[in-house]
């Protein structure tokens, strides 16, 4: 009986931990769709068709997903003219117009991207990153409107247009992983990115099967993952 009580205590503790975890974004009823070897025009067409499905509430897209098993990209952030002081960031290398709204990630300072085109030179940084920038370069008037550099880009100077709430990297049911120590930096994508996020009114097994069948029928020669 003592062993059984201990096991029940552990299970209950894990359940309460899961209830208390907040990844910082709304993942309820959201499915992730990807099409191997697809181009942006194909993804635009695909997402337009998905939006017409009767059980679909909303759609978005991104090149990075903050879950285990999906692409991650890390770079270094600094300010123009200072090559010594830099810090690591996790890069969300292309989110569309609906990403923050659909996943309910608040913009707490500044605004969403105002330059919505392929040559957008704006970025959104999370609160962790904003705090690091303020602490490192002693900015007393915040980060919105400031210029930063980010490695991995040909023209690597960007202007911060907004600050978002922090999100957690890793499995939803855990406390995340070591990447949570790194700030997130968001870039804009004018066209549909690789990972298409589909929010259903109610996510059921048949909803996923219908989604898989619809997308696969559109691109029979491509590998479709839902």
How does the language model describe each region?
Residues 86-177:
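Hydrophobic secondary-structure segments that place a key small or acidic residue at a functional site
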Residues 72-83, 141, 173-182:
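Short, surface-exposed loop/helix-turn segments at secondary-structure junctions
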Residues 22-23, 65-69, 173:
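Surface-exposed extracellular loop regions of Gram-negative outer-membrane beta-barrel proteins
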Residues 33-38, 83-89, 112-120, 134-135, ...:
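Short, contiguous acidic/charged loop-to-helix segments that flank catalytic cores in large enzymes
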Residues 18-44:
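Membrane-interface junction motifs in transport/secretion proteins
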Residues 47-112, 226:
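Short amphipathic beta-strand/extended segments in non-transmembrane regions
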């Amino acid at each position: 009986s003592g062993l059984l009580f201990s096991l029940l205590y552990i299970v209950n503790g894990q359940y309460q931990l899961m209830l208390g975890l907040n990844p910082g974004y709304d993942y309820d009823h959201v499915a992730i769709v990807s099409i191997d070897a697809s181009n942006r025009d194909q993804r635009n067409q695909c997402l337009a068709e998905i939006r017409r499905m009767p059980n679909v509430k909303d759609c978005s897209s991104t090149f990075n997903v903050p879950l285990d098993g999906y692409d991650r990209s890390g770079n270094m952030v600094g300010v123009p003219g200072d090559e010594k002081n830099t810090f690591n960031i996790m890069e969300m290398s292309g989110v569309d117009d609906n990403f923050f709204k659909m996943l309910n990630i608040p913009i707490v300072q500044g605004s969403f991207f105002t330059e919505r085109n392929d040559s957008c030179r704006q970025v959104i940084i999370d609160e962790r990153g904003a705090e690091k920038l303020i602490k490192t370069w002693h900015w007393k008037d915040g980060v919105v409107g400031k210029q930063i550099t980010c490695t991995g880009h040909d023209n690597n100077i960007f202007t911060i247009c907004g600050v978002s709430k922090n999100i957690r990297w890793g499995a939803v049911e855990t406390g995340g992983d070591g990447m949570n120590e790194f700030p997130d930096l968001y870039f804009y994508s004018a066209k549909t990115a690789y990972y298409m996020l589909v929010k259903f009114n109610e996510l059921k097994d048949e909803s996923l099967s219908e989604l898989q069948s619809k997308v696969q029928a559109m691109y029979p020669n491509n590998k479709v993952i839902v």
